[in-house]
A protein has these predicted regions:
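Terminal targeting signals and extreme-terminal segments of soluble enzymes
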Residues: 1-129
């Protein structure tokens, strides 16, 4: 890769739903080449996007559609090509207009990779699919 080009990052191509319960969603994914940053580690934006997506799914699991209102993330350990990540999202506040979701990302060695908190703004009751 040359220094003057951005590396394309992909997030949603290879994840598996482990659990989808009211207020709690778990997915796994493998870090692939398109998940890496310029230095060969999982891109922070990739990790953040996984957490954001899970927060949306947790909101849906409570019966409501929601969008991200505020978020924060702490990156604790780098991930590399081939690592298996488990993304665990839990609703810690199930309010009428907002939901707060805590997300933990761990690797295959059960080491914490990132911890995030998302405040989700409720946009309406989920319509049955």
């Amino acid at each position: 890769m040359s220094d003057n080009h951005l590396h394309e990052i992909r997030v949603f191509e290879n994840f598996d739903m482990v659990s989808f319960e009211k207020g709690h969603v778990i997915v796994t994914t493998e870090v692939v080449d398109k998940s890496l940053n310029y230095y060969g580690f999982a891109h922070g934006g990739y990790i953040f996007t996984l957490c954001d997506q899970i927060s949306g799914l947790v909101s849906i699991s409570t019966g409501f559609d929601a969008v991200t209102l505020q978020s924060s993330i702490n990156y604790l350990k780098s991930s590399k090509l081939g690592d298996t990540l488990l993304i665990d999202g839990r609703c810690v506040h199930d309010g009428r207009t907002t939901k707060v979701v805590d997300v933990t990302v761990t690797n295959q060695l059960k080491q914490e990779v990132a911890k995030a908190t998302f405040t989700m703004f409720v946009t309406g009751k989920r319509k049955d699919d």
